[in-house]
Amino acid sequence: MPYLKLKASYGQVGNSSGVDAFYYRGRMWPQNEVYITGVNMGTKLGGYIQDILPNPGLTWEKARILNIGIDTRLFSDRLSVTAEFFKDNRHDMYVVNNKISSLVGNVKEFKQNIGKINSHGVDLSAMWNSNIADWSYFIGGTFSYSTNELIANGEVDQPYEWLKNQGRPLGENRGYIAKGFFNSWEEIAASPVQTFSDVQPGDVRYEDINKDGQIDVNDMVPIGYGDIPRIMYGINLGVGYKGFSITALFQGAAKVSHQYSDIVMNPFTDNGTIFEHQLDYWTPEHQNATFPRLTTLDNANLNNRQISTLNVKDADFLRLKTLEVAYDLPTK
């Protein structure tokens, strides 16, 4: 008879680690150079302002966590499978309410229990072990998928839907849509104004998402995924024969993006050198290049250093982590 085990758990837990000890009382802070109450023997006497408003209703963050799983073994225990589903809904998270108007005063921050994040995912693992005469072999794998959605975080209302963090996964990359490079001064004159620095042929062109005639922070959109993979997986396999064995372990990740640093994208960063892959840069004779024009001036290069689809790339991978060849000595 096959082995079958069902399991489930549900509960609510609290977390007070992010709650500052005395924020429920507010805070007064000295302002010696801004608010002067008088002078004592040539020394300015500063006043105090309330830079953090009191919030006596603060409480700890809460999480409702659901886990459902199954363990089974089939075919005379040669096949074992484990599958689990989880759901983690966090609420009353301790975050700054950026919707509080500055009209209430010179307030540094006002934290409330208004944050909410929902997460869910699955974990799977399977293993097959068997023998054929003097041969033994196994093959197994693991698979994990998780994602989340920011429901509320106290962010201010945004003029465009693509600027909102709410409704999007945490850690998602945001940047500009690169549309290649300017190839002439005529293209620059006919294009939206790029507000980062003066541009010239060979600089990166960005898409004007909101169609207002200029490229600025209002044109930043979600691009790719975050730096933490949504999918992680592994494959392990092996074969044995009369004391000899070969085993291998593969690891992989998917649905992950990475923003490459300046030293990878821009030659001569921090007084460095130029790498071989950076030689594929724009010139009037080589307009179908991978990188923008060559320059050593940081200010001139500011336009080309923006976070964009030019430097945020797919970071999926599959690698062979270990490969082992072994022989077990006989006991006699």
Describe each PLM feature range.
Residues 1, 8, 68-72, 83, ...:
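Residues on the lipid-exposed face of transmembrane beta-strands in outer-membrane beta-barrel proteins
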Residues 2-61, 80, 84-117:
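Solvent-exposed loop/turn elements at secondary-structure boundaries
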Residues 10-14, 85-91, 128-130, 143-149, ...:
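Transmembrane beta-strands of outer-membrane beta-barrel pores
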Residues 22, 112-115, 129-227:
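Conserved small-residue
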Residues 23-29, 98-106, 155-164, 263-272:
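Flexible, surface-exposed loop regions and adjacent strand-edge segments
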Residues 34-80, 109-132, 167-174, 226-232:
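Outer-membrane beta-barrel signature, preferentially recognizing the C-terminal barrel domain
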Residues 77-81, 122, 133-135, 243-247, ...:
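Repeated loop/turn-to-beta-strand initiation elements of outer-membrane beta-barrel proteins
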Residues 253-332:
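Extracytoplasmic gating/loop element in the C-terminal half of outer-membrane beta-barrel translocons
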